[in-house]
């Protein structure tokens, strides 16, 4: 069973699990739904509901739609980069279908990975894991896929972290260092903080490029604009925080910080856990749900995109993993015409935090220093930079959810439960953490639960 099927099965199991034992709510055909959050999860839920004739109102705390999807344009160069979600995977069927529906073009966004380690540069194809580990790793992935879901052996993976699992399976120190550098970019923190279940499932079920396949032409925010238009911009309320959600008399009332309130038959809350915990829930959330919210952490990621006066790297499909502070680089302007180009540094965890404390010039210096073993002195080509540190984002305090050991099969399932007439959605409940596809799936699943309730 793929992770997507696991989510659907778990969702079915808990869809009717109203976790308010002392309250009874009569069955109503929903006519109005309030959605908290106008990121891609909330917009996807709203779009599905509107297609079924349900009135929707989206309430968004930010001054824009899109949440963690944020395209930035260097206007004078007519070039774009992503400060948030970056990739559309070859396996991301729903997002690909939406792009087709809205007439959005997907462009190849695959790369060939160079390596800088110990100040030594190796081109793509000139480095790899040891043959012994490649063979062992493939057998581990195959074994995981052969296990029956829910079996004791498969569930055991959630008792270890990803780092420990590989150590226990004989990975060498050199291979382990490479895996840490590479895999931590997928999870946003060290692999010592990742459930082995989440870790091995990530790679056992991915496309050959680990879902780093496509990008939306013109920027990923294009899908946000299309969804918002389809839902109706008049149904989206920006710059408004939800303070309280109260369930009574068979309906739900949402109270906002501007004094306004909205009543509906159902609510879908798509906020990350940090913002969700700031809402006053009446009746209150159960203890197991609160415990799960407090357990789940989010990754610290900073993306720093530098506009260079020329594409000195020559290779349009360049990306590079390094053991330096800027960590991972990729060519943001692949398939964008122009002499100028953008390289983006993607740093995680402590690296991200340290970079976030630097001014823009210092960030540029660190990035150019990291690139020196491969390209020499390139600071002379750097014009300016833009960055976003998700670790201090006012509404998320992180980029995306990271499931540690003992959390993949426990915390996530708990957080997928509804709270009376309130349903929850978002990237943190999805099978593909950190991908737009997962957020869409989660939003649509919540909408389907309401439609079928």
Model-derived segments and spans:
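FAD-dinucleotide binding site
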Residues: 2-453
């Amino acid at each position: 069973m793929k992770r997507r099927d696991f989510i659907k099965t778990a969702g079915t199991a808990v869809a009717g699990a109203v976790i308010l034992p002392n309250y009874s709510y009569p069955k109503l055909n929903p006519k109005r739904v309030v959605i908290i959050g106008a990121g891609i999860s909330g917009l996807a839920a709203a779009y599905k509901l509107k297609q079924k004739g349900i009135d929707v109102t989206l309430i968004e705390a930010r001054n824009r739609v899109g949440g963690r999807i944020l395209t930035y344009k260097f206007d004078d160069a007519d070039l774009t980069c992503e400060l948030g979600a970056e990739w559309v995977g070859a396996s991301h069927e729903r997002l690909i279908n939406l792009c087709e529906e809205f007439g959005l073009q997907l462009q190849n966004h695959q790369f060939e990975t160079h390596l800088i380690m110990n100040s030594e540069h190796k081109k793509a194809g000139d480095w790899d894991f040891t043959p012994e580990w490649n063979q062992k790793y493939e057998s581990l992935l195959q074994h995981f896929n052969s296990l029956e879901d829910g079996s004791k052996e498969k569930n055991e993976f959630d008792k270890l972290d990803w780092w420990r699992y590989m150590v226990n399976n004989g990975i060498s120190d050199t291979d382990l260092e490479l895996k840490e550098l590479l895999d931590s970019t997928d999870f946003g923190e060290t692999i010592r903080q990742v459930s082995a279940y989440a870790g091995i499932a990530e790679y056992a079920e991915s496309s050959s490029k680990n879902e780093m396949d496509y990008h939306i032409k013109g920027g990923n925010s294009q899908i946000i604009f299309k969804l918002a238009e389809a839902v109706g911009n008049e149904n989206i309320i920006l710059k408004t925080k939800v303070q309280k959600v109260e369930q009574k008399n068979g309906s739900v009332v949402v109270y906002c910080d501007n004094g306004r309130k909205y009543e509906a038959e159902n609510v879908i809350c798509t906020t990350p856990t940090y913002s969700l915990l700031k809402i006053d829930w009446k009746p209150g959330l159960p203890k197991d749900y609160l415990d799960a919210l407090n357990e789940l952490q989010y990754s610290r990621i900073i993306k720093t995109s530098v506009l260079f006066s020329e594409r000195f790297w020559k290779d349009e499909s360049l990306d590079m993993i390094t053991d330096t502070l800027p960590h991972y680089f990729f060519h943001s302007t692949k398939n964008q015409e122009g002499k100028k180009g953008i390289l983006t540094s993607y740093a995680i965890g402590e690296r991200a935090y340290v970079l976030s404390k630097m001014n823009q010039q210092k960030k540029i210096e660190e990035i150019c220093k990291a690139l020196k073993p491969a390209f020499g002195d390139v600071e002379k080509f750097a014009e300016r930079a833009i960055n976003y540190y998700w670790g201090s984002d006012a509404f998320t305090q992180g980029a995306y959810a990271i499931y540690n050991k003992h959390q993949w099969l426990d915390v996530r399932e708990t957080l997928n439960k509804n709270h009376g007439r309130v349903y929850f959605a978002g990237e943190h409940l999805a099978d593909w953490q950190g991908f737009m596809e997962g957020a869409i799936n989660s939003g649509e699943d919540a909408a389907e639960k309401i439609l079928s309730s």
